């Protein structure tokens, strides 16, 4: 089968002929229709320090996808041939304390599809049936292929009550932009998103952000005054991993504010903890998606009218995969879809 593999321990990714994966008794075999390129895939492509420590070479990568079930393990129930599915990319152990308590998104033994095991940039993928999620008929393949990052946005945004609240999102990558759309859809008052990438800030405006602020040109506190805000942001969603962005968030949070952190800093990050203490802030770390409450909420949000389609900006056939990675690497894109049909 065709597959995109991290074939060498250097920058790049390669289109190869790989063996079709073998299925176990509790697995599904999925014929891939579309995949999306994640920021994680770009780290792997660029072969940065994290990738060098984490990714086995050679390995098929990728973890954002939609496809069709073409074979079912003999122990599997609840799926049939022809089901259209995406899937949770975090494979959990099932036996640690959190797994046994139903908090599988906090499994201490998580294995990542396309990170620690063979991924979805291929014509076929095998995953445990537990990890598959049936896609409703009224949700397109394009949208289903980005459910993984959309789930990060939904999990982060819905960590706290948003109705009537003022929300600050730091980092206008695709996940931050989708989070802005979610916040507006569920009833936040002002949703302000910050970045220095004007292309992505414009995408955020299209997706419903009240204000998309280029912090290299505008002062965040001036924007707050313009919006009539007198007490600070009620909810903060940190999506950038950039220390200066998090510092600005702590400066502008209201007393008693709540912060959800998804962005991963490049290293240790020092902050002024007195701001957290004296403001009485609550900080919550976010990793992945809740299984499977986040997935049901994703489908329901789209079915209730949330439109995240503007975040998909580029489409390529798999043979043109290099153009897709170039588009992602340029910073002048939203989500990039690769078609395997």
Swiss-Prot record:
Its cofactor is Zn(2+). Zn(2+) 2 binds at residues 93, 96, 99, 107. It is found in: Cytoplasm. It catalyses: L-threonine + NAD(+) = (2S)-2-amino-3-oxobutanoate + NADH + H(+). Pathway: Amino-acid degradation; L-threonine degradation via oxydo-reductase pathway; glycine from L-threonine: step 1/2. NAD(+) binds at residues 175, 195, 200, 262-264, 286-287. Binds 2 Zn(2+) ions per subunit. Keywords: Cytoplasm, Metal-binding, NAD, Oxidoreductase, Zinc. The record marks 148 as: Important for catalytic activity for the proton relay mechanism but does not participate directly in the coordination of zinc atom. Zn(2+) 1 binds at residues 38, 63-64. Homotetramer. Belongs to the zinc-containing alcohol dehydrogenase family. This is L-threonine 3-dehydrogenase. The gene is tdh.
């Amino acid at each position: 089968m065709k597959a995109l593999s991290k074939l060498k321990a250097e920058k790049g990714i390669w289109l190869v002929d790989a063996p079709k994966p073998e299925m176990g008794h509790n697995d599904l075999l999925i014929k891939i229709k579309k995949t999306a390129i994640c920021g994680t895939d770009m780290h792997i492509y660029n072969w940065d320090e994290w990738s060098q420590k984490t990714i086995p070479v050679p390995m098929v990568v990728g973890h954002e996808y939609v496809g069709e079930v073409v074979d079912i393990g003999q122990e599997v129930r609840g799926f049939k041939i022809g089901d259209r599915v995406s899937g949770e990319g975090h494979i959990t152990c099932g036996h640690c304390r959190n797994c046994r308590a139903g908090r599988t998104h906090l499994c201490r033994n998580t294995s990542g599809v396309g990170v620690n095991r063979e991924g979805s940039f291929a014509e076929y993928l095998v995953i445990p049936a537990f990890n598959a999620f049936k896609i409703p008929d009224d949700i397109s393949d394009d949208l289903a292929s980005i459910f993984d990052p959309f789930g990060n946005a939904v999990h982060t945004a819905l960590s706290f009550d948003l109705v009537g609240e003022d929300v600050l999102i730091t980092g206008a990558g695709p996940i931050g932009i989708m989070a802005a759309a979610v916040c507006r859809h569920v009833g936040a008052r002002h949703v302000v998103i910050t970045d220095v990438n004007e292309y992505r800030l414009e995408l955020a405006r299209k997706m419903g952000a009240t204000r998309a602020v280029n912090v290299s040109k505008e002062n965040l506190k001036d924007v707050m005054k313009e919006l009539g805000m007198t007490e600070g942001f009620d909810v903060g969603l940190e999506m950038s991993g950039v220390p200066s962005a998090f510092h600005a968030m702590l400066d502008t949070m209201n007393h008693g504010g709540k912060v959800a952190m998804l962005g991963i800093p490049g290293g240790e990050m020092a902050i002024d903890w007195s701001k957290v203490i004296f403001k009485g802030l609550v900080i919550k770390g976010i990793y992945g998606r809740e299984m499977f409450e986040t997935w049901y909420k994703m489908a329901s949000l789209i079915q209730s009218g949330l439109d995240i389609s503007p975040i998909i900006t580029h489409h390529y056939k798999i043979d043109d995969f290099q153009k897709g990675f170039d588009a992602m690497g340029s910073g002048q894109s939203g989500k990039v879809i690769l078609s395997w049909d």
